C-alpha cells in the first residue's frame, strides 16, 4: 500500500512539474528562484563553498589548443554565447518575417529602444560623473532582461493585448541588438590578429553553409564551436560569436524545412530553464556582509538604479511619444500611451543582462566593493521596475 502511495505521489509531482514548465511565466519564475538561492547562499555559512564552486578551474584542451577559465567565466563566456545564438535567431526571424520586417512595423519600437538605451546611459553618467573609475559602467542600465519582463507580463497574459506583447518583444530584440553593438565596440580588448583570421574563416564557412541552405544543425554547431573559441582567443567578446551563428542558420532549407525554427525550439527551453537561471545563480550572489546604510548613497548604486527606474521609462516613453507627435512613427493599433508607459517601466528590469554588462564593465580588478555595489544597484533597480511595471500594466490593461 505504501509502495502504491509513493508511486501515486511521484506521478502527481511529475505532473505538477510538467504543468509548471508549460506556464508562460515559468522562465521568469525560475530566474527569480535562482537569484534568490544565490543570494541566500552568498549570505549563509555556505558562502565560501558557493564562491569556491564558482571559481573552480575548468580547462579544455585539444592538442596544443587550450582554454583555462573558472566556472563562472565558462558560464559568462560560454553559456551566454549559446543564449546569444538564440538572440541572433530571434532577431533574424523578426527582421525577415516578423515584427521588424517592414519599416512601419520596425520604426516605432526602434525609436523607443534608442530612447531606452540613450537616456539610462545619460542618467548613469550624470550621477556617476564625479568618480572617473565608474565611467565604464554607463552601459549597465541600458539592458532589458526580456525573460523577466515577459515573465511579469505573462502573469497578466489574459488581459494584455497582443499588440502590446509584440511591442515589448520587438523593443527587447532591438535592445539586444544595441547591447551587441556596445559589447563589440566598447568591451573588446587586446585583439589577436591570428585568432581574428581563424574567426573570419569560420564566418565564411557559416556564410557558405547558409548560402547553400544546409539544414544539418550539427554542421553549424561544429563550425560555431570553432568560431566561439577563435573569437574568445581574439579579444572580442565571445558572445558575439553566438549572434553570428544565430544569423547564419537559414530560415528555410532546400526541401522547405525550417532549420532556424527547429534550432530555436531546441534552444529556447535550454535558454529559459538552464542557461539564464544558471547565469543568475552565478552572478546574483551578492553578499550583504559589511554593507551599511551609507552604501545606499553610493554614486554607483544610485546611478545604476536610477538609470533602470527613471532612465528606462523616461527614454522609452519619451522617445515613443515624440516619434508619434512628430509624425515619425504611428502608435500600433489596439494599445495606448498609458500601456506604453507601463511597458517602459517594465523594461527597467535589467537583471541578468545588466549583470552581464556589469561583469564586462567592472572585472575582478575593479574591487569587491565596486562589483557588490553594481549588483546591488541592478537588483534594486530591477526589483522596483518589476513591481511598478506589474502594477502599472495591471491598471492600464484593466482600464482598456
UniProtKB/Swiss-Prot annotation:
It is found in: Cell inner membrane. Its main location: membrane. GO terms for molecular function: sodium:proton antiporter activity. It catalyses: Na(+)(in) + 2 H(+)(out) = Na(+)(out) + 2 H(+)(in). The keyword DNA damage does not apply. Gene3D superfamilies: Na+/H+ antiporter like domain. GO terms for cellular component: plasma membrane. The chain crosses the membrane at residues 26-46, 71-91, 107-127, 137-157, 166-186, 189-209, 212-232, 233-253, 273-293, 299-319, 340-360, 373-393. It comes from the Bacteria. GO terms for biological process: regulation of pH. It is a multi-pass membrane protein. Signal peptide: none annotated. Keywords: Antiport, Cell inner membrane, Cell membrane, Ion transport, Membrane, Sodium, Sodium transport, Transmembrane, Transmembrane helix, Transport. InterPro entries: Na/H_antiporter_dom_sf, NhaA. Na(+)/H(+) antiporter that extrudes sodium in exchange for external protons. Belongs to the NhaA Na(+)/H(+) (TC 2.A.33) antiporter family. PANTHER family: NA(+)_H(+) ANTIPORTER NHAA, SODIUM ION/PROTON ANTIPORTER NHAA-RELATED. This is Na(+)/H(+) antiporter NhaA. It comes from Haemophilus influenzae (strain 86-028NP).
